[in-house]
Amino acid sequence: MRLTYFGKIGDGNTSLLRNAGLAGLLSRSSTRKANLVNSLQMAEHRGWNVAEAHEKRSIHTDSIRLEVETDSGVTVVEGVVLLEKPRLIQVDGIYCELALSGFLIFMKNQDVPGVIGHVGTVLGRNKINIANFSLGRRDAPSAPGEPLEAVALVSTDELVPESVLAQLRDNPAVKFARSVEFRA
């Protein structure tokens, strides 16, 4: 895991920010409760490499970028606090923006016609209300003739069950779909 702090946010002691990020990551994969006090020790016990960097350049004055490497690859997210609310602003180099609160579907897909309609139809059929929908896509395809890669962040009024996520993945353009709950 690598945290990069941009702007003044990195000028002070960032240990609480680091530990909060670790606690969030550990909460999804550990039976032991991770918190601000024990998260660094838990990560080290698991053999995680935790690195921090401070940089002055960013589109946003103060932001935090998190890079996580797993067996399936590297995921990079960046966030800011706007109007006293944490917001995601970038996923794997694709800019999209959504408040990090409540329930969220995180989706990677090909930018082709019908994906947004598919998401709305599947959620509507399952009586799940969309509170907000944010899209972003790469500026260029990964290879000539390939569709652009896209990210969809869908805020919903309830946690989306795995059975509904599987219906989203039934569309061949949807490469990844996961439901996340952000707790205060």
Predicted segments, located by residue:
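A conserved regulatory-domain signal marking ACT and ACT-like small-molecule sensing domains
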Residues: 1-10, 14-184
